[in-house]
């Protein structure tokens, strides 16, 4: 039986944020009755906000699903995920601490453009293994609308393709589905919620992020400049990207 949530750990979520997540889950059929959902908790503001949103949905939605949490520990210096475990267990949820020497294996990629993507692929593989081992069939990730927009422009500028991340898709093996319930949410919303609640945010400590400005950061700055001129920017981008985001929604 899944642990129940303690009343004292129920975190209020802003209605707008909750509505946007609920709409995304409905629009893309992200969670089905009886699903066992494993949330990838990095310790950032986005995954911590998503944890609060999904625990609230689990309590109040008519949709019945199980929820667990996994944190990938890349064995990088100063990464201490214990506060995340305390937070998750305080919510009455199972927490899986996945220790893998991703940091060590990635050192030979340091300084190359592929460094971040290499780490991301490694982390994703660890999460897939955890989900399969523990009997989960859905992996929930914390990318938001800003992330989708940045990926869209990076693909267009550097690969000559109109692509972005998918809101909901099956992995190649067919046994897991991956969902991104924050697809309609803005980064500033998750930041305001996580910081306002005093959630145990872990600051990024990857040396590659400090030494080399990423292309994603450049896209973030470009979009911020354009949004300052046109506040409707992300609404328009969402409309433009929706066919791309929905292309692999499972039947």
Task: Go through each PLM region and give its residues.
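ATP-dependent adenylation/nucleotidyltransferase module used to activate substrates
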Residues: 2-152, 158, 188-196, 248
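Generic structural signal for well-ordered, non-membrane alpha-helical segments
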Residues: 14, 120, 212-215, 230, ...
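Catalytic subdomain that performs nucleotidyl-dependent activation
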Residues: 66-67, 146-218, 222-225
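Short, solvent-exposed coil/turn elements at secondary-structure transition points
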Residues: 73-75, 101-103, 171, 184, ...
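Long, contiguous binding/interaction regions
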Residues: 87, 153, 227-231
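An accessory alpha-helical subdomain
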Residues: 218, 222-244
């Amino acid at each position: 039986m899944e642990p129940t949530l303690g009343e004292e750990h129920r975190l209020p979520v802003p209605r707008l944020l909750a509505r946007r997540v609920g709409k995304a889950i409905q629009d893309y059929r992200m969670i089905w009755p009886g699903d066992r959902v494993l949330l990838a908790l990095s310790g950032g503001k986005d995954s911590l906000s998503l944890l609060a949103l999904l625990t609230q949905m689990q309590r109040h939605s008519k949709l019945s699903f199980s929820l667990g949490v996994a944190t990938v520990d890349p064995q990088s210096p100063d990464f201490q995920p214990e506060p995340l475990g305390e937070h998750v267990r305080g919510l009455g949820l199972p927490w899986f601490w996945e220790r893998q020497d991703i940091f060590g294996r990635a050192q030979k990629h340091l300084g190359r453009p592929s460094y971040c993507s290499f780490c991301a692929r490694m982390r994703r593989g660890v999460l897939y293994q955890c989900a399969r081992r523990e009997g989960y069939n859905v992996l929930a990730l914390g990318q938001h609308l800003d992330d989708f927009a940045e990926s869209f422009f990076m693909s267009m500028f550097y690969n000559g393709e109109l692509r972005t991340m998918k809101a909901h898709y099956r992995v190649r093996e067919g046994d897991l589905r991956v969902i991104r319930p924050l697809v309609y949410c803005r980064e500033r919303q998750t930041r305001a919620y996580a910081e306002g609640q005093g959630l145990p945010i872990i600051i990024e400590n990857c040396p590659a992020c400090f030494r080399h400005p990423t292309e994603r950061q450049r896209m973030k700055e470009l979009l911020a400049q354009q949004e300052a001129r046109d506040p409707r920017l992300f609404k328009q981008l969402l409309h433009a990207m929706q066919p791309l985001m929905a292309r692999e929604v499972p039947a």
